Amino acid sequence: MSLELLSQLETKIQATLENIELLKMELDEEKQKNEALLSQQQELTQKNQQLQQDLNSWSDKVNGLVGLLNNEI
């Protein structure tokens, strides 16, 4: 092989390695975003469960009051 071909090959390999490094950095960023979203999802799921429990509690209280009113009438 001529030196020119070797130089072209080296340039292509270097560009490929740089591209791989960029892709690794992008992958790391996406992994971090994914972890943050999973954490946020867990928090929202817990909050949703708490709100569901609160709603059920208030529904029971309202139904109890309606029952008392019906008994009085």
From Swiss-Prot:
It comes from the Bacteria. GO terms for biological process: division septum assembly; FtsZ-dependent cytokinesis. InterPro entries: Cell_div_ZapB. It comes from Shewanella frigidimarina (strain NCIMB 400). The lineage of its organism: Bacteria, Pseudomonadati, Pseudomonadota, Gammaproteobacteria, Alteromonadales. One of its GO terms (cellular component) is cytoplasm. Belongs to the ZapB family. Residues 3-66 form a coiled coil. Keywords: Cell cycle, Cell division, Coiled coil, Cytoplasm, Septation. Non-essential, abundant cell division factor that is required for proper Z-ring formation. It is recruited early to the divisome by direct interaction with FtsZ, stimulating Z-ring assembly and thereby promoting cell division earlier in the cell cycle. Its recruitment to the Z-ring requires functional FtsA or ZipA. Its main location: cytoplasm. This is Cell division protein ZapB. It is found in: Cytoplasm. Homodimer. The ends of the coiled-coil dimer bind to each other, forming polymers. Interacts with FtsZ.
